[in-house]
Amino acid sequence: MEVDNKRRHSEDELKQEAVKKIKSQEPNYAYLETVVREKLDFDSEKICCITLSPLNVYCCLVCGHYYQGRHEKSPAFIHSIDENHHVFLNLTSLKFYMLPQNVQILHDGEVQLLNSIKFAAYPTYCPKDLEDFPRQCFDLSNRTYLNGFIGFTNAATYDYAHSVLLLISHMVPVRDHFLLNHFDNQGEFIKRLSICVKKIWSPKLFKHHLSVDDFVSYLKVREGLNLNPIDPRLFLLWLFNKICSSSNDLKSILNHSCKGKVKIAKVENKPEASESVTGKVIVKPFWVLTLDLPEFSPFEDGNSVDDLPQINITKLLTKFTKSRSSSTSTVFELTRLPQFLIFHFNRFDRNSDHPVKNRNQTLVEFSSELEILHVKYRLKANVVHVVIKQPSTDGNAFNGDEKSHWITQLYDNKSEKWIEIDGINTTEREAELLFLKETFIQVWEKQE
């Protein structure tokens, strides 16, 4: 793991540098000394805190609040006078202004303080930047983090989205497309998604964690995200399909990198002849390959977790690599293996009154490498399911369903270590112990 020994410049150093650069050009620019980067949060919904309008919104760089307009009597103008806050950033154009003078700060690219703020709002990259990713970074409080392996706030509500965004951010062709391109001419969905990926890989975060609350709220309100119940698999499929309908370039990348094909046929074994195909043979594309776990009976109270049944992933894959031996069966044959092979382990019966409490808790054993039809894969990501027990309100045992919580485990190629991301917390994990939790989704990368 590469350690960047150059810690962030202190606020005083950056402010002194900023004022020295341009104070001689315009006395009012001395207000740059009042900027407080610690109060800035560009993950929140970009609406005016007074009018609730999303149009023409500016961020006050002194208090971090969002205000509309720049003209006289606008919320931003009034705020600059009432609170003596004078430095603002237009959240669309990323241009800086002094209010109430209504003067644009020119040559802002020469001022490190303003550059850092612009990068926090909209990170940009060149190919050389990506060569040493991931690397150890520092936030404004000098807390270390590994870019690309970022924690998220509000995990109790949006942990499924955190897992999926991390998964796609670690598919290198998808990641690189988002990091190296601008999406000003794309639709709002692609623009917002690209910013999420750019921030996940940012080496210059103000805080060592992110929030996707605004992004998910946008998906629900504007893009028709209405999945109930929702889990990482359902959200991943929804997101892939939405990406493909929104961007031809990304559709091509996803089809090449993540879409496999499986041939499905009915086979009848006859005693007097070799097995023959009956009925229609179809070839179906897939984003996610579902692996069925063996039947499982939920524990009675008092049973030990050590009694959990276990099965090796290779046995689950025989459905797709070997013919069935029953007299009449459906045979599945993988005809295209993608660069990123995504497995889903089917744990829930959504027809159950308590699908989480009655889930299949079988543990899946796996190593870091896997060979399927003579093609070698390496495990890149593992999303696991854990249970949050619901508290009782009347002192009696809780009779409702339990709540799912999702944790993401990602492999760092550079350090050859596994990093577990649970909310805002990131922890190193031993590869040999990953299977001890309920694996739900895995991403495997083809090895050339």
From Swiss-Prot:
GO cellular component: nucleus; spliceosomal complex; U4/U6 x U5 tri-snRNP complex
CDD domains according to UniProt: Peptidase_C19M
Superkingdom to which the source organism belongs: Eukaryota
GO MF, one example: zinc ion binding
Taxon lineage: Eukaryota, Fungi, Dikarya, Ascomycota, Saccharomycotina
GO terms classed as biological process: mRNA splicing, via spliceosome; protein deubiquitination; spliceosomal complex assembly
Designated name of the protein: Pre-mRNA-splicing factor SAD1
Ligand binding (Zn(2+)): C60, C63, H79, H85
Keywords: Acetylation, Metal-binding, mRNA processing, mRNA splicing, Nucleus, Ribonucleoprotein, Spliceosome, Zinc, Zinc-finger
Keyword Cytoplasm found: no
Principal location class: nucleus
Note: Present with 167 molecules/cell in log phase SD medium.
Modified positions (N-acetylmethionine) in chain numbering: M1
Subunit (UniProt): Component of the 45S U1.U2.U4/U6.U5 penta-snRNP particle, a subcomplex of the spliceosome.
Gene3D superfamilies, per the entry: Cysteine proteinases, Zinc/RING finger domain, C3HC4 (zinc finger)
Function text: Promotes the assembly of newly synthesized U4 snRNA into the U4/U6 snRNP particle. Required for splicing of pre-mRNA.
PROSITE patterns per the UniProt record, alphabetical: USP_3 (PS50235), ZF_UBP (PS50271)
Occurrences of domain USP (ranges): 150-447
Localization: Nucleus
Zinc finger extent (UBP-type): 27-124
